[in-house]
């Protein structure tokens, strides 16, 4: 990549280890993933063999305990930021998502699951042999997690689960699903987590065709009197809400990192096209209006990158910083949307052709702006955190 479009991995946030990790990861992505992303996107899936190859490289296990096949010693939150932004360079969010559903489905199990569940599930997922998904959203409840209705009734050594989940990334191919279910009264304290396994009688899934992220399957999950062993309870009954909320802030931070990475890919493609393409006897970049588009894209990207790194550093120090994470994700997805549009204007008709990186990114703007909390939900969350909702 032209150095002009690099993220500068400078101190105090980055070390030589971070730079070595990025170089190694970039070589792997450029050699093993980038040449195939359009093929996988058009096919609507990433082959299982690729999941295993990515795991063998070490990407799947990042941040997970060594005893289960992961690696966490010497890693920090900036390794995850680098991972998100390097995957975003592919301009194929569906591929990145398909290879990363474990990053949201597995942590609750690692934190609160029984030793038996951890030994049975984590190594299989971290080796790329199995896929795990997280199921929260329902047809009648999304960001309002406390309003979830999928019910799990205790009957002896089993829970009987009835209800449905929707918009579940990886839901069609998942071997395991970390599902939020209601085991108690209404509200947050009545929610629990259950590990539900593919093939269990009464558990089915239907695919949801969508605008972007084609390589990542998305599904509605149906639970019809599904018998789930009580041993598959993750944590205590009623602890589900806390486990999920602990996961959400990191998920939003990584979505912001990926959105800024995608915006940077748009800038690179627009700048390279503008330098090569000639109109009216001169290169596009010689037109002031085009140069100003590139500068404005760069300005927004670099501002967002600085906000991202500052917020990540605060999280690394143990701060919750929920308001900043919410505002960061809003800012990052707006930057992605702006840069996708401006890059499309610079590339013209070429940006509308399938196989073009900008074309894929343009289709993926909305899922980034909505997933993990919409702009409206996150703005209101930030307002409450900052005390703007009080008299």
Regions found by a protein language model. Give the residues of each.
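Flexible, small-/acidic-enriched active-site or ligand-binding loops
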Residues: 147, 199-229
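A short core secondary-structure module
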Residues: 158, 162-206
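Long, acidic (Asp/Glu-rich), low-complexity accessory segments flanking structured domains
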Residues: 225-243
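A short, Trp-centered hydrophobic/proline-enriched beta-strand micro-motif
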Residues: 128-136
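Hydrophobic, small-residue-rich alpha-helical packing segments that form membrane-like cores
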Residues: 141-144, 159
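Alpha-helical interface subdomain recognition
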Residues: 1-89, 100, 112-116, 124, ...
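Short glycine/proline-enriched turns and hinge-like loops at secondary-structure junctions
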Residues: 74-75, 144-146, 170-175, 188-190, ...
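N-terminal glycine-rich flavin-associated loop
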Residues: 96-116, 142
